[in-house]
Amino acid sequence: MAENQDYASGNGGIKALLLNFIHSQSFSGIFLFFCAVVAMISANSALSESYFHLWHTEIGFFIGETFIGMSLHHWINDVLMSFFFLMVGLEIKRELLFGELAGIKRAAFPAIAALGGMIVPAIVYTLFNFGTDSAHGFGIPMATDIAFALGVLLLLGDKVSLALKVFLVSLAVVDDLGAVVVIAIFYTEDLQTLWLLYSVVILGLLIGLNKMGVRSLFPYAILGVLLWITVHNCGIHATIAAVALAFTIPVKPKIESENFAQEAKELLERFLSHDKERANLLLASEQVHSVELLSKHSKSVQSPLVRLEHALHPWSAYFIMPVFAFANAGVAISSNIHFDIDGVLPGIMLGLIVGKPVGILGLTYLAEKMGIATRPEGVMWIDILGAGMLAGIGFTMSIFITNLAFTNPEATDVAKIAILSASLFAGALGYFFISIRCRFKKKKEACCTIKS
């Protein structure tokens, strides 16, 4: 495992990678909230007609007289979101191999927490919608928006322990994995066998590339596009293709870190061996060659998985998810909305606000009492409850599942209003709860210091 960790990011790299992830996701959450607010304002202002008309704009190209394309809304939800799910898949793979989910013992607690945070909200929703046309939306309150949740923790600053942040990230990664499984199993249309067979063949080729030691990302990208097309046509949501692609991206770099260190040392010595005065004015051809080789080796020593994840992170955090939020969070609130459609509103709201913390705290408590899992060091039960409240922020992932679960526009609008309301309430509740908890903890530590 130590050897694999070097492939991921070097000594101490996992912690740096995690801190960078938390930092970027936290700011992304604040930006997402801003985009959601702008979307709601646009949908309920004089711009309303233009806002909704924009997403129905057809974008594509003609082959002869045949138009191949989709609405802008579908380009965002099916194509752009595939890049987000590719990043999610890479994060899941990295966490399973090197992170907090590496090994059964380390993964047990956050995995059980995520399981509780998915099962109980689904049960709560089903209790309100059993036997109705809206029962298919049980997956909506199962999701957690990690960017929003970490954004709330960012507002609390250094008062929140790193252990709690790590737990919340680990929980969210498993939650994302659960969401992928739910989408693949429960929100799949009638399967087209031939296209499914094509998908399996292409996936086999991707696995073959990995096994053959191909480290260039270009062939994976080509086959990834073909996989997206075949999965989209076979009836499974195309974002699942992105997750499958992520799991075939190689972890091991082209050059081992020990070999890179030796080669880099030799190249630097060769660079410095040339005339210094000449080098100050114009690099000699040998020096240029050394620099080019060093640059090439620097890329080859990086894990393809981590390199791709780093490349996708800023695009996902500051473009893809904000665009998705702006395109999907806008709901025109009017007297024509029927909030009493089955039990959609209470099912989603109570599922996220109550079901999430109860499920996370309840199942982890039982697991520890039964000796199945152990709480992370430095994380108290009251912290688990606070994290459970923040996990109730469903937002983007819940909205994404809403679009798959409902075909009725009225049910979709009610679900989005419920998601936005519940996410806002869960975020505020989690913020004040953890803030008060940190304040009492600080006072207690101060008292202990005075006594000692």
Swiss-Prot record:
It is found in: Cell inner membrane. It holds the Pfam family Na_H_antiport_1. Keywords: Antiport, Cell inner membrane, Cell membrane, Ion transport, Membrane, Sodium, Sodium transport, Transmembrane, Transmembrane helix, Transport. One of its GO terms (biological process) is regulation of pH. It catalyses: Na(+)(in) + 2 H(+)(out) = Na(+)(out) + 2 H(+)(in). InterPro entries: Na/H_antiporter_dom_sf, NhaA. GO terms for cellular component: plasma membrane. The keyword Cell membrane applies. Its main location: membrane. It comes from the Bacteria. GO terms for molecular function: sodium:proton antiporter activity. The chain crosses the membrane at residues 27-47, 67-87, 108-128, 137-157, 166-186, 194-214, 216-236, 314-334, 343-363, 381-401, 414-434. It is a multi-pass membrane protein. NCBIfam families: NhaA, PRK14856.1. Belongs to the NhaA Na(+)/H(+) (TC 2.A.33) antiporter family. Na(+)/H(+) antiporter that extrudes sodium in exchange for external protons. This is Na(+)/H(+) antiporter NhaA. It comes from Wolinella succinogenes (strain ATCC 29543 / DSM 1740 / CCUG 13145 / JCM 31913 / LMG 7466 / NCTC 11488 / FDC 602W) (Vibrio succinogenes). The gene is nhaA.
